[in-house]
Amino acid sequence: MDAPTLLLAAGSNGRGQLATGDSRDAHSFTPSKFARREISSTSPPSPELSPTIISIVGGGNHTLVLLSWVNDTAPSLEVWGCGEGAKGQLGPGYNADSEGRDESAVLRPLVLPWEEQGLFGYTIFHVAACWETSFFVLRKSDQRDILASMGGNDFGDLGIGDAPSKKMIKAPFHIVDLSHIVGSTAQHVSITDVITGPHHVIVLLRADKKQYIAGWGTARHGQLGPLLLPSGRALPFSPSPVVIDLPIDVQLDPVLSVRAGNQHSVFLHASGHISALGSDAKGQLQGLRTAEGVQAIDCTWNGTYIQTPQGLLSTGTNARGQLGRREHASKALSGAVRFPVEARVLDFACGSEHVLALIESQGRKEVWGWGWNEHGNLGTGSLDDVNVPVKIWPPPAVESEAMTSIAVRVWAGCGTSWIAVSK
């Protein structure tokens, strides 16, 4: 994505989380706005220089974008954000900075207080978000990786245990203690991924050449494994990280990626097999344990999607067309997503109950989408749900321009969608 990149957004925007400059839902894809970047001695020569978009994540009403700027020495990673910040999920000064202006609807660099708390020399290299909470992985040479959390703590989302006071919750950020997961004497501890559902969090770690998996937050449906109260009833939520054990030994077959729905969690192993935890009430786990050769995974709140050499498969609820095939059902068995054209899936992203797919068809890159569309998040100009995949980029009005504007990445959130277009 070295060429100048345009970020387009559609969908739910009540708190300005699309960064379109206002707080109206966008029913068609609209450019996201970036604030002008302050120039410093380490900044690129021009604030208009297009950065590389590393990732986009979002909660219920806030968005984080991890950007890489290239200067004369090395790439510089920054976190930009927009939307709702009342719980501190966008940093302690975010709301004060935007008071009286409409800057909550524009992406701007977040002022995060690491150095004020003694964390000097750390670089953010990964971000994640659940409903009203944000997570930042901090890395420094020859030090253990640090996981910081900030924002709301419903269902223990912050991962800091039973907070003894409101003052602790109002701290600018928190350090998630993972030492009991890997052991206090472990060396070379790296956090390789942080994945969230609406209210549960899963972390992949490596320490001393071994893999560990930890999680916290909502747990009632087994999405963190079988956690029980002394009474034998399911633990509603865990406010502190717990070890997640999988049926497949991760030391022999490590986990490459994790995705989370509302009440389920899915793990892709190096062998191409899948482990799954949590609720199957909507059929969201159907067929996963016998799948082979899986290349990529993702989850909506109540569904699971796997990419195989044979194509994109889906399982779970199809009440709003989420599975990309016509039969409507609150619970459907695993089957293929039915593109009406010959399609090679290059990338795909699941939102709360909708899906975007970047495909190659007849030598052209296009974005197709389907599922729940109440906020216009599929960018069709309509609020009607979409039962089978339809092309959403490029739209007919810009077909000729699209010959020089190529979709390169897609992301999806809670009723929100993003497309990165390279010119």
Residues of each region from the PLM?
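Eukaryote-biased RCC1-like beta-propeller repeat architecture
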Residues: 1-423
